[in-house]
Amino acid sequence: MGIDPHIIRAWLTARSLARGLPAPIADRGALRVDTQSDGEIQRWVFAEVNAQLRELGCSLDTPGYLLKLCGSASDLRAALPLAWQLHAPAYFMAGPCTAARQPLPPGYTAALTQNGPVVQVRLTTAAGELVASGFAAETEHAFIYDRIVTDPAHRRRGLGRAMMSLLGQAKQKRTAPELLVVTPDGRALYERLGWQTISPYSTASIPDARPPG
C-alpha cells in the first residue's frame, strides 16, 4: 500500500498553486497535472504501483511526460518498460506543525512577498547578494513548502532553518499538515527540524534523444 491519496492530493494542489500550474485532476488511478512547460507536458503522481501505472508506462513512448510514485525507485523501475529512466531520488516528508521560530543569522536580511495563498521569502547578504529563497502555499487541506534553495557557499549557517521558520509564520490554519518533497541532502536537514519521511518519492521519464540545438 502507498500513502494516503488524500495527502498526495492536498500536497499536489498546493504545489500547483505555488507554481502557477493547473490543479491536479484524477486520471488513470493517479493525479495528473498538465504542466505544459518547457521540457514537460504532463505528470502523473501515483500513490502506489497499480495496473494503470504499468499501462500508462507502456502507452507513452516520447519525452515530456513524468511518472511519479510515492514508493521506491526499484518498484517504479520494475513497473515500466526499459525506455524509462529514473531520476535522482527524493522523499515525501511531513512536518511537526509546531516548530519553534528560528532567528535569522547575523549579516542577512529577509524579504517576504505574499500573493494570495502563496508566500516567497528571499534572504540576502548585507551587500544585497541573494543567497537563499523559498516558497510556501496554503490551502484548506495543507501547507506546503516548495523550491527551498540555499547557495552552497552559505550553507550550514542556519539559513535553511530560518527560511522554514519565516515561511511557516505565514501559515493560517495551524492544524493543516505541513508537507514537502526533498532531496537526500535536504532530508537530513528537515529530519533535524523534526520532519518525518512518509514515503520515498520516485520519478521516471523517457529521455530526449535529440541532439541539442
Report the location of each language-model feature.
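Conserved acetyl-CoA-binding loop-helix of GNAT-fold acetyltransferases
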Residues: 52-55, 150, 156-170, 192
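Acyltransferase donor/substrate-recognition loop-hinge adjacent to the catalytic core
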Residues: 80-120, 125
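Conserved active-site alpha-helix within GNAT-family acetyltransferase domains
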Residues: 74-84, 161, 173, 184-201, ...
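N-terminal charged segments
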Residues: 1-77
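C-terminal "cap" of GNAT-fold acetyltransferases
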Residues: 89-99, 181-184, 200-213
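A conserved beta-strand-loop-helix scaffold within acyl/acetyltransferase catalytic domains
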Residues: 113-151
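A short helix-loop-beta-strand connector motif used in the catalytic cores of GNAT acetyltransferases and
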Residues: 24-31, 38-43, 88-89, 113-121, ...
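Conserved GNAT acetyl-CoA-binding A-motif
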Residues: 61-71, 170-183
